[in-house]
Amino acid sequence: MNLSEYLAQADALAAECHALLAGLDVATRLDVAKGQLNALKDDRLNALQSALRMLPAEDRRAAGGAFNTLKQSIQAALDAFGQRQSAASGVVQVDATMPARGIWRGSLHPVTLVIDEISEIFRELGFTIALGPEAETEWYNFGALNFPPDHPAMELHDTLYLGEDTLLRTHTSPVQVRTLQRYAPPVRVLAPGQVYRRDFFDATHAPAFMQLEGLAVDEGVSFVDLKATLAEFARRFYGATRRVRFGPSYFPFVEPGAQMDVEVDLGDGKGLRWVEILGCGMVHPNVIEAAGLDSEKYTGWAFGMGPARIAMSRYGINDIRVLYDSDVRFLEQFAR
Protein backbone atom coordinates (compact mmCIF):
# COMPACT_ATOMS: atom_id res chain seq x y z
CA MET A 1 0.00 0.00 0.00
CA ASN A 2 1.38 3.41 -0.99
CA LEU A 3 0.59 6.78 0.59
CA SER A 4 -2.18 7.73 -1.83
CA GLU A 5 -3.98 4.42 -1.26
CA TYR A 6 -3.59 4.85 2.50
CA LEU A 7 -5.10 8.33 2.45
CA ALA A 8 -7.95 7.17 0.20
CA GLN A 9 -8.86 4.34 2.62
CA ALA A 10 -8.77 6.73 5.58
CA ASP A 11 -11.07 9.19 3.82
CA ALA A 12 -13.45 6.39 2.80
CA LEU A 13 -13.70 5.06 6.37
CA ALA A 14 -14.38 8.55 7.74
CA ALA A 15 -17.15 9.08 5.18
CA GLU A 16 -18.78 5.72 5.97
CA CYS A 17 -18.72 6.38 9.74
CA HIS A 18 -20.30 9.80 9.26
CA ALA A 19 -22.95 8.32 6.97
CA LEU A 20 -23.76 5.55 9.46
CA LEU A 21 -24.28 7.91 12.39
CA ALA A 22 -26.14 10.47 10.30
CA GLY A 23 -28.57 7.79 9.17
CA LEU A 24 -29.44 6.53 12.66
CA ASP A 25 -32.70 7.60 14.25
CA VAL A 26 -32.23 9.77 17.34
CA ALA A 27 -34.30 7.21 19.28
CA THR A 28 -31.43 4.72 18.87
CA ARG A 29 -29.73 4.13 22.21
CA LEU A 30 -26.19 5.49 22.38
CA ASP A 31 -24.73 2.10 23.30
CA VAL A 32 -26.42 0.55 20.25
CA ALA A 33 -25.03 3.32 18.03
CA LYS A 34 -21.54 2.77 19.42
CA GLY A 35 -21.86 -0.95 18.80
CA GLN A 36 -22.73 -0.45 15.15
CA LEU A 37 -19.94 2.09 14.76
CA ASN A 38 -17.36 -0.23 16.31
CA ALA A 39 -18.43 -3.07 14.05
CA LEU A 40 -17.79 -0.82 11.05
CA LYS A 41 -14.50 0.79 12.04
CA ASP A 42 -12.50 -1.36 14.47
CA ASP A 43 -10.98 -3.89 12.07
CA ARG A 44 -10.29 -1.25 9.42
CA LEU A 45 -8.68 1.12 11.92
CA ASN A 46 -6.42 -1.67 13.13
CA ALA A 47 -5.48 -2.48 9.54
CA LEU A 48 -4.60 1.17 8.83
CA GLN A 49 -2.52 1.35 12.00
CA SER A 50 -0.60 -1.77 10.96
CA ALA A 51 -0.14 -0.45 7.42
CA LEU A 52 1.33 2.77 8.80
CA ARG A 53 4.43 0.91 9.95
CA MET A 54 4.90 -0.61 6.49
CA LEU A 55 5.01 2.72 4.61
CA PRO A 56 8.31 4.30 3.60
CA ALA A 57 9.77 6.54 6.27
CA GLU A 58 9.21 9.70 4.22
CA ASP A 59 5.43 8.94 3.95
CA ARG A 60 4.76 8.04 7.59
CA ARG A 61 4.45 11.65 8.78
CA ALA A 62 1.63 12.42 6.34
CA ALA A 63 -0.04 9.04 6.88
CA GLY A 64 0.18 9.40 10.70
CA GLY A 65 -1.46 12.82 10.52
CA ALA A 66 -4.24 11.38 8.36
CA PHE A 67 -4.76 8.51 10.83
CA ASN A 68 -5.13 10.91 13.78
CA THR A 69 -7.48 13.11 11.77
CA LEU A 70 -9.56 10.02 10.96
CA LYS A 71 -9.99 9.10 14.66
CA GLN A 72 -10.88 12.70 15.55
CA SER A 73 -13.41 12.82 12.73
CA ILE A 74 -15.11 9.62 13.89
CA GLN A 75 -15.31 10.91 17.48
CA ALA A 76 -16.73 14.21 16.23
CA ALA A 77 -19.43 12.32 14.32
CA LEU A 78 -20.31 10.35 17.46
CA ASP A 79 -20.45 13.55 19.52
CA ALA A 80 -22.74 15.10 16.93
CA PHE A 81 -25.07 12.11 17.18
CA GLY A 82 -25.17 12.51 20.96
CA GLN A 83 -26.02 16.20 20.58
CA ARG A 84 -28.87 15.31 18.21
CA GLN A 85 -30.19 12.92 20.85
CA SER A 86 -29.97 15.57 23.58
CA ALA A 87 -31.83 18.08 21.44
CA ALA A 88 -34.55 15.56 20.63
CA SER A 89 -34.95 14.47 24.26
CA GLY A 90 -36.59 17.80 25.07
CA VAL A 91 -39.59 16.73 22.98
CA VAL A 92 -41.82 14.34 24.92
CA GLN A 93 -43.47 11.79 22.68
CA VAL A 94 -46.31 9.78 24.18
CA ASP A 95 -48.05 6.87 22.50
CA ALA A 96 -51.44 6.77 24.21
CA THR A 97 -52.20 3.40 22.64
CA MET A 98 -49.38 1.64 24.51
CA PRO A 99 -50.53 -0.53 27.43
CA ALA A 100 -49.59 0.74 30.88
CA ARG A 101 -46.69 -0.86 32.68
CA GLY A 102 -47.45 -2.68 35.92
CA ILE A 103 -46.20 -1.26 39.20
CA TRP A 104 -43.81 -3.43 41.19
CA ARG A 105 -45.06 -3.66 44.74
CA GLY A 106 -42.69 -4.55 47.52
CA SER A 107 -43.81 -6.85 50.30
CA LEU A 108 -42.61 -8.40 53.51
CA HIS A 109 -41.33 -11.96 53.37
CA PRO A 110 -43.96 -14.55 54.39
CA VAL A 111 -41.86 -15.56 57.41
CA THR A 112 -41.66 -11.91 58.47
CA LEU A 113 -45.42 -11.59 58.03
CA VAL A 114 -45.94 -14.58 60.33
CA ILE A 115 -43.50 -13.23 62.94
CA ASP A 116 -45.21 -9.84 62.92
CA GLU A 117 -48.67 -11.38 63.28
CA ILE A 118 -47.63 -13.72 66.09
CA SER A 119 -45.79 -10.90 67.88
CA GLU A 120 -48.88 -8.70 67.73
CA ILE A 121 -51.06 -11.47 69.17
CA PHE A 122 -48.72 -11.99 72.11
CA ARG A 123 -48.38 -8.24 72.66
CA GLU A 124 -52.15 -8.16 73.07
CA LEU A 125 -51.77 -10.99 75.61
CA GLY A 126 -49.36 -8.93 77.70
CA PHE A 127 -45.97 -10.01 76.32
CA THR A 128 -43.08 -7.72 75.41
CA ILE A 129 -40.27 -8.37 72.92
CA ALA A 130 -36.86 -9.50 74.23
CA LEU A 131 -33.70 -10.04 72.20
CA GLY A 132 -30.40 -11.79 72.79
CA PRO A 133 -27.04 -12.30 71.02
CA GLU A 134 -26.73 -14.79 68.18
CA ALA A 135 -23.15 -15.61 69.21
CA GLU A 136 -23.58 -17.26 72.61
CA THR A 137 -21.50 -18.91 75.28
CA GLU A 138 -21.83 -22.62 75.78
CA TRP A 139 -23.18 -21.99 79.29
CA TYR A 140 -26.10 -19.82 78.17
CA ASN A 141 -26.92 -22.06 75.22
CA PHE A 142 -26.66 -25.39 77.07
CA GLY A 143 -25.48 -25.33 80.68
CA ALA A 144 -27.97 -22.81 82.05
CA LEU A 145 -30.76 -24.63 80.21
CA ASN A 146 -30.21 -27.93 82.03
CA PHE A 147 -28.44 -29.74 79.19
CA PRO A 148 -26.23 -32.51 80.61
CA PRO A 149 -22.53 -32.20 79.64
CA ASP A 150 -22.74 -35.26 77.37
CA HIS A 151 -25.90 -34.19 75.54
CA PRO A 152 -25.54 -34.97 71.78
CA ALA A 153 -26.69 -31.45 70.79
CA MET A 154 -23.38 -30.14 72.16
CA GLU A 155 -21.32 -32.15 69.68
CA LEU A 156 -19.61 -30.55 66.69
CA HIS A 157 -21.84 -32.42 64.25
CA ASP A 158 -24.90 -30.56 65.59
CA THR A 159 -23.59 -27.16 66.71
CA LEU A 160 -21.54 -24.48 64.95
CA TYR A 161 -18.76 -23.50 67.36
CA LEU A 162 -16.91 -20.19 66.99
CA GLY A 163 -14.35 -20.98 69.67
CA GLU A 164 -13.78 -23.26 72.62
CA ASP A 165 -16.67 -21.77 74.60
CA THR A 166 -18.55 -19.69 72.00
CA LEU A 167 -21.02 -20.83 69.38
CA LEU A 168 -23.85 -19.73 67.14
CA ARG A 169 -26.94 -20.26 69.25
CA THR A 170 -28.96 -23.33 68.37
CA HIS A 171 -32.21 -21.92 69.78
CA THR A 172 -33.55 -18.70 71.26
CA SER A 173 -33.91 -20.31 74.71
CA PRO A 174 -30.81 -18.52 76.11
CA VAL A 175 -32.95 -15.38 76.08
CA GLN A 176 -34.94 -17.00 78.91
CA VAL A 177 -31.96 -16.95 81.26
CA ARG A 178 -30.70 -13.53 80.18
CA THR A 179 -34.16 -12.02 80.67
CA LEU A 180 -34.61 -13.53 84.13
CA GLN A 181 -31.16 -12.28 85.13
CA ARG A 182 -32.04 -8.76 84.03
CA TYR A 183 -35.66 -8.38 85.11
CA ALA A 184 -37.45 -9.44 88.27
CA PRO A 185 -40.70 -11.42 87.87
CA PRO A 186 -43.39 -11.13 86.75
CA VAL A 187 -41.90 -11.67 83.28
CA ARG A 188 -43.74 -12.23 80.02
CA VAL A 189 -41.54 -11.97 76.93
CA LEU A 190 -41.51 -13.12 73.31
CA ALA A 191 -38.03 -13.54 71.81
CA PRO A 192 -37.76 -13.71 68.00
CA GLY A 193 -34.36 -14.37 66.49
CA GLN A 194 -32.11 -16.25 64.09
CA VAL A 195 -30.71 -19.61 65.18
CA TYR A 196 -28.20 -21.97 63.60
CA ARG A 197 -27.89 -25.74 63.29
CA ARG A 198 -25.45 -27.96 61.45
CA ASP A 199 -28.27 -29.28 59.27
CA PHE A 200 -28.45 -30.09 55.58
CA PHE A 201 -30.75 -27.87 53.53
CA ASP A 202 -33.69 -30.05 52.53
CA ALA A 203 -37.47 -29.85 52.28
CA THR A 204 -37.97 -29.57 56.05
CA HIS A 205 -34.62 -28.34 57.45
CA ALA A 206 -32.43 -25.25 57.08
CA PRO A 207 -29.02 -24.51 58.64
CA ALA A 208 -30.17 -21.01 59.66
CA PHE A 209 -33.74 -20.08 60.46
CA MET A 210 -35.92 -17.87 62.63
CA GLN A 211 -37.36 -19.03 65.93
CA LEU A 212 -39.84 -17.53 68.39
CA GLU A 213 -39.38 -18.17 72.09
CA GLY A 214 -42.01 -17.33 74.70
CA LEU A 215 -41.49 -17.15 78.47
CA ALA A 216 -43.78 -16.40 81.41
CA VAL A 217 -42.45 -16.49 84.99
CA ASP A 218 -44.26 -15.43 88.16
CA GLU A 219 -45.48 -16.80 91.45
CA GLY A 220 -48.12 -19.49 91.06
CA VAL A 221 -47.81 -19.95 87.27
CA SER A 222 -49.12 -23.37 86.19
CA PHE A 223 -49.51 -25.62 83.18
CA VAL A 224 -53.13 -24.49 82.98
CA ASP A 225 -51.91 -20.96 82.22
CA LEU A 226 -49.66 -22.32 79.47
CA LYS A 227 -52.48 -24.28 77.80
CA ALA A 228 -54.93 -21.40 78.03
CA THR A 229 -52.50 -18.87 76.56
CA LEU A 230 -51.33 -21.06 73.68
CA ALA A 231 -54.88 -22.18 72.86
CA GLU A 232 -55.90 -18.52 72.69
CA PHE A 233 -52.95 -17.81 70.40
CA ALA A 234 -54.00 -20.66 68.07
CA ARG A 235 -57.59 -19.42 68.06
CA ARG A 236 -56.50 -15.92 67.00
CA PHE A 237 -53.90 -17.06 64.48
CA TYR A 238 -55.64 -20.02 62.82
CA GLY A 239 -59.29 -19.20 63.52
CA ALA A 240 -61.78 -19.90 66.30
CA THR A 241 -62.98 -23.16 64.72
CA ARG A 242 -59.57 -24.89 64.63
CA ARG A 243 -58.97 -27.53 67.27
CA VAL A 244 -55.74 -27.84 69.26
CA ARG A 245 -54.29 -30.69 71.27
CA PHE A 246 -51.34 -31.16 73.60
CA GLY A 247 -49.15 -34.25 73.80
CA PRO A 248 -46.10 -35.19 75.88
CA SER A 249 -42.63 -34.27 74.64
CA TYR A 250 -39.13 -33.82 76.04
CA PHE A 251 -36.85 -30.80 76.24
CA PRO A 252 -34.06 -30.52 78.84
CA PHE A 253 -35.14 -27.04 79.94
CA VAL A 254 -38.81 -27.82 80.71
CA GLU A 255 -40.53 -30.37 82.95
CA PRO A 256 -43.09 -31.52 82.05
CA GLY A 257 -42.63 -30.96 78.33
CA ALA A 258 -45.31 -30.97 75.66
CA GLN A 259 -46.03 -30.22 72.04
CA MET A 260 -49.08 -28.44 70.67
CA ASP A 261 -50.75 -29.61 67.48
CA VAL A 262 -53.29 -27.65 65.45
CA GLU A 263 -55.68 -28.85 62.78
CA VAL A 264 -54.61 -27.16 59.55
CA ASP A 265 -55.29 -27.53 55.85
CA LEU A 266 -52.00 -27.83 53.96
CA GLY A 267 -53.67 -27.13 50.63
CA ASP A 268 -52.99 -30.58 49.17
CA GLY A 269 -56.63 -31.61 48.90
CA LYS A 270 -56.50 -33.88 51.94
CA GLY A 271 -58.39 -31.53 54.25
CA LEU A 272 -57.60 -30.80 57.88
CA ARG A 273 -54.89 -32.74 59.68
CA TRP A 274 -52.95 -32.45 62.90
CA VAL A 275 -49.68 -30.54 62.56
CA GLU A 276 -47.20 -29.84 65.36
CA ILE A 277 -46.55 -26.10 65.54
CA LEU A 278 -44.60 -25.67 68.79
CA GLY A 279 -42.92 -27.28 71.76
CA CYS A 280 -43.62 -26.07 75.27
CA GLY A 281 -43.58 -26.93 78.97
CA MET A 282 -43.01 -25.73 82.50
CA VAL A 283 -39.61 -24.10 82.96
CA HIS A 284 -37.30 -26.56 84.71
CA PRO A 285 -36.41 -25.52 88.28
CA ASN A 286 -32.72 -25.80 87.38
CA VAL A 287 -33.17 -23.10 84.71
CA ILE A 288 -34.86 -20.78 87.19
CA GLU A 289 -32.05 -21.40 89.69
CA ALA A 290 -29.41 -20.78 86.98
CA ALA A 291 -30.96 -17.35 86.42
CA GLY A 292 -30.54 -16.54 90.10
CA LEU A 293 -34.18 -16.96 91.18
CA ASP A 294 -35.75 -19.13 93.85
CA SER A 295 -37.45 -22.08 92.14
CA GLU A 296 -39.51 -22.70 95.28
CA LYS A 297 -41.06 -19.25 94.90
CA TYR A 298 -41.26 -18.81 91.14
CA THR A 299 -42.56 -21.05 88.39
CA GLY A 300 -42.88 -20.44 84.71
CA TRP A 301 -43.69 -21.85 81.32
CA ALA A 302 -42.05 -21.49 77.95
CA PHE A 303 -42.60 -22.38 74.33
CA GLY A 304 -40.64 -22.33 71.11
CA MET A 305 -41.89 -22.30 67.53
CA GLY A 306 -40.44 -22.03 64.04
CA PRO A 307 -42.22 -19.28 62.08
CA ALA A 308 -41.00 -20.77 58.79
CA ARG A 309 -42.86 -24.01 59.46
CA ILE A 310 -45.89 -22.08 60.65
CA ALA A 311 -45.76 -20.08 57.41
CA MET A 312 -45.68 -23.39 55.53
CA SER A 313 -48.79 -24.59 57.35
CA ARG A 314 -50.50 -21.21 56.88
CA TYR A 315 -49.84 -20.91 53.14
CA GLY A 316 -49.83 -24.58 52.10
CA ILE A 317 -46.08 -24.79 51.37
CA ASN A 318 -44.53 -28.27 51.45
CA ASP A 319 -40.85 -27.40 50.89
CA ILE A 320 -39.07 -24.96 53.22
CA ARG A 321 -36.49 -24.15 50.54
CA VAL A 322 -39.12 -22.18 48.64
CA LEU A 323 -39.00 -19.61 51.45
CA TYR A 324 -35.28 -18.99 50.88
CA ASP A 325 -35.06 -19.07 47.06
CA SER A 326 -35.72 -15.32 46.60
CA ASP A 327 -38.02 -16.16 43.70
CA VAL A 328 -39.95 -12.96 42.94
CA ARG A 329 -42.79 -14.94 41.34
CA PHE A 330 -43.38 -16.62 44.70
CA LEU A 331 -42.73 -13.64 46.97
CA GLU A 332 -44.91 -11.16 45.07
CA GLN A 333 -47.98 -13.21 46.03
CA PHE A 334 -47.65 -11.80 49.54
CA ALA A 335 -47.72 -8.12 48.53
CA ARG A 336 -50.57 -6.34 50.26
Swiss-Prot record:
<dbReference type="GO" id="GO:0006432">
    <property type="term" value="P:phenylalanyl-tRNA aminoacylation"/>
</dbReference>
<keyword id="KW-0067">ATP-binding</keyword>
<dbReference type="GO" id="GO:0000287">
    <property type="term" value="F:magnesium ion binding"/>
</dbReference>
<comment type="similarity">
    <text>Belongs to the class-II aminoacyl-tRNA synthetase family. Phe-tRNA synthetase alpha subunit type 1 subfamily.</text>
</comment>
<dbReference type="InterPro" id="IPR045864">
    <property type="entry name" value="aa-tRNA-synth_II/BPL/LPL"/>
</dbReference>
<keyword id="KW-0547">Nucleotide-binding</keyword>
<keyword id="KW-0436">Ligase</keyword>
<dbReference type="GO" id="GO:0000049">
    <property type="term" value="F:tRNA binding"/>
</dbReference>
<keyword id="KW-0648">Protein biosynthesis</keyword>
<dbReference type="InterPro" id="IPR002319">
    <property type="entry name" value="Phenylalanyl-tRNA_Synthase"/>
</dbReference>
<feature type="binding site">
    <location>
        <position position="255"/>
    </location>
    <ligand>
        <name>Mg(2+)</name>
    </ligand>
</feature>
<dbReference type="InterPro" id="IPR004529">
    <property type="entry name" value="Phe-tRNA-synth_IIc_asu"/>
</dbReference>
<dbReference type="GO" id="GO:0004826">
    <property type="term" value="F:phenylalanine-tRNA ligase activity"/>
</dbReference>
<dbReference type="InterPro" id="IPR022911">
    <property type="entry name" value="Phe_tRNA_ligase_alpha1_bac"/>
</dbReference>
<dbReference type="InterPro" id="IPR006195">
    <property type="entry name" value="aa-tRNA-synth_II"/>
</dbReference>
<keyword id="KW-0479">Metal-binding</keyword>
<dbReference type="InterPro" id="IPR004188">
    <property type="entry name" value="Phe-tRNA_ligase_II_N"/>
</dbReference>
<dbReference type="GO" id="GO:0005737">
    <property type="term" value="C:cytoplasm"/>
</dbReference>
<dbReference type="Pfam" id="PF02912">
    <property type="entry name" value="Phe_tRNA-synt_N"/>
</dbReference>
<dbReference type="Pfam" id="PF01409">
    <property type="entry name" value="tRNA-synt_2d"/>
</dbReference>
<keyword id="KW-0963">Cytoplasm</keyword>
<keyword id="KW-0460">Magnesium</keyword>
<keyword id="KW-0030">Aminoacyl-tRNA synthetase</keyword>
<protein>
    <recommendedName>
        <fullName>Phenylalanine--tRNA ligase alpha subunit</fullName>
        <ecNumber>6.1.1.20</ecNumber>
    </recommendedName>
</protein>
<dbReference type="GO" id="GO:0005524">
    <property type="term" value="F:ATP binding"/>
</dbReference>
<comment type="subunit">
    <text>Tetramer of two alpha and two beta subunits.</text>
</comment>
